[in-house]
Amino acid sequence: MARIAGVDLPREKRAEIGLTYIYGIGKATANEILAKAEINPDTRIKDLSEDQVNELRKVIDDDFLVEGDLRREIALNIKRLRDIKCYRGIRHAKGLPLRGQRTKTNARTRKGPRKTVSRKKKK
């Protein structure tokens, strides 16, 4: 099993798909990495030689931000927005949508489960 960027890649998958198991690498990025490493995207992970795996590691380490480093950078970007108290930072802090979506209805994914408010009883 190939281990790249701290992630065990599934042996039976094609290289193009296997690389997407790494956080920060999608299909397009995986194809770009394989092109730089001169590896056929249809090759199975189990069929990659040790040299090819090392070449993939080298390309990913040199050119791409993945896994923990990417997560850290995203967290720092959000923290910066919160610290400067811009609109987006305030929305992050309140747990509301950032990009202009309506919140009177919908927005449940961002706001979480409903918090019901009890009504006063009629006399």
From Swiss-Prot:
Disulfide bonds: none
Coiled coil: none
InterPro entries given in the database record: Rbsml_uS13_C (IPR027437), Ribosomal_uS13 (IPR001892), Ribosomal_uS13-like_H2TH (IPR010979), Ribosomal_uS13_bac-type (IPR019980), Ribosomal_uS13_CS (IPR018269)
Cellular-component GO terms for this entry: cytosol; small ribosomal subunit
Keywords from the UniProt entry: Ribonucleoprotein, Ribosomal protein, RNA-binding, rRNA-binding, tRNA-binding
A GO molecular-function descriptor: rRNA binding
Top-rank taxon: Bacteria
Region of interest: Disordered: 95-123
Gene Ontology biological process terms, A to Z: translation
Pfam (any one): Ribosomal_S13
Biased composition (Basic residues): 101-123
Assembly notes: Part of the 30S ribosomal subunit. Forms a loose heterodimer with protein S19. Forms two bridges to the 50S subunit in the 70S ribosome.
Record-linked NCBIfam families: uS13_bact
Record family assignment: Belongs to the universal ribosomal protein uS13 family.
UniProt function note: Located at the top of the head of the 30S subunit, it contacts several helices of the 16S rRNA. In the 70S ribosome it contacts the 23S rRNA (bridge B1a) and protein L5 of the 50S subunit (bridge B1b), connecting the 2 subunits; these bridges are implicated in subunit movement. Contacts the tRNAs in the A and P-sites.
Identification of the protein by name: Small ribosomal subunit protein uS13
Organism name: Clostridioides difficile (strain 630) (Peptoclostridium difficile)
Gene of this entry: rpsM
